[in-house]
Design a protein with these regions (language model features):
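Extracellular beta-sheet/turn segments enriched in Thr/Pro/Gly and aliphatic residues
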Residues: 69-103
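Short amphipathic beta-strand segments in non-cytosolic proteins
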Residues: 13, 20-31
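Short, acidic Ser/Thr/Gly-rich low-complexity loop/linker segments typical of extracellular
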Residues: 27-41
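Structural motif
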Residues: 2-17
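Short beta-strand/loop motifs in extracellular/secreted proteins, especially
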Residues: 18-20, 52
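Short, small/polar residue-rich loop motifs at catalytic or cofactor-binding pockets
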Residues: 3, 24-26, 159
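Charged/polar helix/coil "stalk" or linker segments at domain boundaries
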Residues: 113-204
């Protein structure tokens, strides 16, 4: 069973990456050629069987889509597409999205806290109600930080070279600081992506 594939550079208009070293269980080690192409020649595996994530290495680069290639269903017709990025790219994008989202949320929270304090000063709410509202905001802040820790890296790994319309909207929302909306759309995008992969895996 031969599995063909390509290695491309993240966010580069699908530029090929030559000289990548690849190994997989039950297949001899191989390297990408000048066009980023490679081929695994498995001795026992057959089309339709799942494989563990191949080991992918090139000095100065990091693997971007490990989750997608882990458990890959072998196919004679469908190439294994691997994406790599210069080291530090994902962390840089993650920090960028983190900073944008925190700044947007903090501004929103500061405005809400000021409104609550003004209501209390104007004696439109009681001390207890003021305390309850501020506690609710603090809980909202904790929930927000948990969400951003969970999703910032996932957003950073979305490859602009190969995204659907919903994933494009996700990145636009994140860049606008609208994390909750981005998370909702990202989860929808995950369902669509999984469905698309299952359909494509039927063609072996």
């Amino acid at each position: 069973m031969s599995q063909k594939g390509t290695v491309q550079i993240f966010n580069s208009n699908k530029s090929p990456l030559p000289g990548v070293q690849l190994t997989a269980t039950d297949a001899p080690a191989t390297d990408t050629d000048a066009n980023g192409n490679f081929q695994f020649n498995f001795s026992k595996q057959k089309p339709g069987m799942a494989i563990a994530s191949p080991n992918v290495y090139k000095k100065g680069y990091e693997l971007v889509n490990k989750d997608m290639i882990n458990g890959w269903i072998l196919s004679k017709k469908r190439p294994l597409s691997i994406v790599m990025a210069p080291e530090g790219t994902i962390e840089e994008s993650k920090n960028k999205y983190y900073s944008i989202s925190v700044a947007h949320f903090s501004k929103k929270q500061e405005k809400a806290i000021e409104e609550v304090n003004q209501l209390y000063i104007a004696q439109k709410i009681s001390l207890q109600e003021r305390s309850d509202r501020l506690k609710a905001m603090a809980e909202e802040s904790r929930s927000f930080m948990n969400q951003i820790d969970q999703y910032a890296e996932k957003f950073a790994r979305i490859n602009p070279d190969d995204i659907n319309a919903i994933e494009k909207q996700v990145l636009e929302l994140v860049n606008a600081g609208k994390l909750s909306e981005a998370i909702e759309l990202y989860n929808k995008s995950g369902i669509i992506t999984q469905a698309r992969e299952k359909l494509s895996q039927k063609t072996k």
